[in-house]
Structures are given as C-alpha cells and as structure tokens.
C-alpha cells in the first residue's frame, strides 16, 4: 500500500490490513513529493510520524501501521482478513444509513468549527434524528426486541 493507496488508507473510516501488507511513502526515493497525500497522512498519524515515513521513504509492516493508527486492525492470515472484513460489513449493516452519514459529517466538523456552535448544531441534529424515521424505527425495534428494518434479515 504505497503512495496513493497509503493516502486512501489514511482517509478511510475503517482500515484492515492483511498479514503481508506493507505501507509506505516512497515518493522522495523516486524524486517526487507526496503532494496529494501528505495532508491526509499528517492528519491521520501526526506530523512527526509523517515526516519520518516521508523523508526517509520508509516501508512499514501491517503491525507498525496499526500502531501508528493508519489501520485499525491487522489480520494474521488471509482467512482472518476475510472474517474481519465480513464482520465490519455486518456491523455497517446494523447501523442506520442516515444516522451514520450524519455522524460522519459531525465528526468531520470537529476541530474546524467553534465547539459551542458545533454542540448546538449537534443537539439540533440529535432532536431531528429522534423524531425521524430511523430514530422511530430504531426505538421501536429496541422495545420490540427485534432488528431494525435497515439491518435486514441476513443474520
């Protein structure tokens, strides 16, 4: 997972690495700069680690990538990778689509807006969600001890 792929891992919501995955920013060893991905790498792992990887053109294994926060989980085998992926996708299906999108949008606003305005906006979004169709369905499903409609019948 080099260059642009490394950048994609840094902007992903959930990243799972296989047992043989290698990550790196080889651009400087190729005579170019990691212009498009550098801001995302810094945001994901911090300036000092991004400098170390980029300025030395380092390649790291999946465990180091997990330690740095580039990926969230590592698999010891290809079979475990498939299991972790299936589990993550199953968890996604258990979450309401609109609530998930609104949550992601809220999280991306943190650090870019004043906290007071962000909290006010979040409270408004929460109230809308409670009154909305997903909030109603989720509450009813919980009370009736069943899966919400968006979760499907596959499990």
Q: Over which residues does each language-model region extend?
A:
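Conserved catalytic core of Hanks-type protein kinase domains
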Residues: 44, 56, 129
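Functionally critical, cavity-lining and gating residues within the transmembrane helices
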Residues: 2, 34, 47, 135
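Short helix- or helix-capping micro-motifs
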Residues: 49-58
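Glycine-rich beta-to-alpha active-site loop
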Residues: 1-30, 59-62
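Hydrophobic, secondary-structure "cap" segments at the distal end of domains
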Residues: 39-48
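C-terminal long alpha-helix characteristic of the crotonase
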Residues: 16-21, 71-120, 124, 149-155
């Amino acid at each position: 997972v080099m260059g642009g792929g490394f950048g994609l891992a840094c902007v992903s919501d959930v990243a799972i690495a296989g047992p043989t995955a290698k990550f790196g920013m080889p651009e400087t060893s190729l005579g170019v700069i990691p212009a498009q991905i550098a801001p995302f790498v810094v945001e994901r792992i911090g300036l000092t680690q991004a400098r170390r990887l980029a300025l030395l053109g380092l390649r790291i294994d999946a465990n180091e990538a997990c330690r740095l926060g580039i990926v969230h989980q590592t698999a010891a085998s290809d079979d475990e990778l498939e299991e972790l992926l299936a589990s993550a996708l199953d968890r996604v299906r258990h979450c309401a689509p609109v609530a998930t999108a609104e949550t992601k949008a809220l999280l991306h606003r943190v650090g870019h807006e004043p906290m007071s305005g962000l909290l006010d906006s979040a409270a408004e979004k929460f109230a809308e969600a409670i009154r909305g169709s997903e909030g109603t369905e989720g509450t009813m499903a919980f009370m009736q001890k069943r899966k919400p409609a968006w979760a499907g019948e596959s499990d």
